Swiss-Prot record:
Binding residue positions for Zn(2+) 2: D111, H112, D187, H226
Lineage start: Eukaryota, Metazoa, Chordata, Craniata, Vertebrata
Coiled-coil ranges (or none): none
Binding site for Zn(2+) 1: H107, H109, H163, D187
Keywords: Cytoplasm, Hydrolase, Metal-binding, Mitochondrion, Transit peptide, Zinc
Protein name: Hydroxyacylglutathione hydrolase, mitochondrial
Keyword Zinc assigned: yes
Binding site for substrate: K196, F197, F198, H226, E227, Y228, R302, K303, E304, K305
């Protein structure tokens, strides 16, 4: 979400300016004191997803954001995705005993890129990647299919404009590994949803979701920018009330979130079963939208979602 016009803009500004000496990560406090103005979301548990070749720590930030610490287990080199709260990043890096070398910025909005300039002052020598000159502290501007390494991990940049005109998703693999790849999707693809079309069109979001992300291996794990899963699934249920995959995922998401755990990651295979924006080619979604083609359907359901009143149940 953008800082301007953002319903939490005041909180965003205050949380960034306030010096954070300590944070809760898992069940332990880090640092010397606790930030008085932390949101309930920030106090939720972090989550570590471990594979034999890479480790991803989901770090809650602000009111519903996630930062992701990506660790190459072989070299102990690390990258951070969208480090809006730099002190929390530094604390996580120290906890894991790794070397932070890289910042992966999905887009320029404050709640994703707003910590870059502070972080590069806290950690020297960082390479800051992104696809938009509006990104703070940018050192490496990338484009579609740009590749680079984080230790032994291979990172491929995927250009997915629409939410913003310079949005990049980061697809991470380990050569010769049998483990699932990971993709960090920022505000393009959410669990059961997609980002608002602030600087783009239905055609662009269709291309991003179906023709770019949708062609990645189905087992790819999706790490998105926000904890919007429950509300997204309630809209998905509204679009397809008879879809059992949506009902099952919503029940799971409620239970998982209420237990203090993130509902992320999902997989691309899952998204095609319950995400209406990934299902715009399905007859049931087109009939709900009153459209006959997937791109018109994409535009119609995004417009409807923008004004959707989320039910309590």
């Amino acid at each position: 979400m953008m800082l301007f016009g953002c319903r939490r803009s005041l909180w965003c500004a205050l949380s960034f300016l306030g010096a954070a000496a300590g944070y809760r990560v898992g069940s332990a406090y880090l640092g010397t004191s606790v930030l008085q103005n932390q949101t309930p979301f920030e106090l939720r548990n972090s989550k570590v997803v471990t594979q034999c070749t890479m480790k991803v720590e989901l770090i809650p930030a602000l009111t519903d954001n996630y930062m992701y610490l990506l660790i190459d287990e072989e070299s102990k080199e690390a990258a951070i995705v969208d480090p809006v709260q730099p002190q929390k990043v530094v604390d996580a890096v120290k906890k894991h005993g790794v070397k932070l070398t890289t910042v992966l910025t999905t887009h320029h909005h404050w709640d994703h890129a707003g910590g870059n300039e502070k972080l590069v002052k806290m950690v020297s020598g960082l390479k800051v990647y992104g696809g938009d000159s509006r990104i703070g502290a940018l050192t490496q501007k990338v484009s579609h299919l740009t590749t680079f390494q984080v230790g032994s991990l291979h990172v491929k940049c995927l250009y997915t404009p629409c939410h913003t005109s310079g949005h990049i998703c980061y697809y991470v693999t380990k050569p010769n590994s049998t483990e699932p790849p990971a993709v960090f999707t920022g505000d393009t693809l959410f669990v059961a949803g997609c980002g608002k079309f602030f600087e783009g069109t239905p055609e662009e979001m269709y291309a991003a979701l179906i023709e770019v992300l949708g062609r990645l291996p189905p087992e790819t794990r999706v790490y998105c920018g926000h904890e919007y899963t429950i509300n997204n699934l309630k809209f998905a249920r509204h679009v397809e009330p008879c879809n059992d995959a949506i009902k099952q995922k919503l029940a799971w998401a409620k239970e998982t979130y209420n237990s203090g755990e993130p509902t992320i990651p999902s997989t691309l295979a899952e998204e095609f079963t319950f995400n209406p924006f990934m299902r715009v080619r399905e007859k049931s979604v087109q009939e709900h939208a009153g459209e006959r083609d997937p791109i018109s359907t994409m535009g119609a359901i995004r417009k409807e979602k923008d004004h959707f009143k989320v039910p309590k149940d």
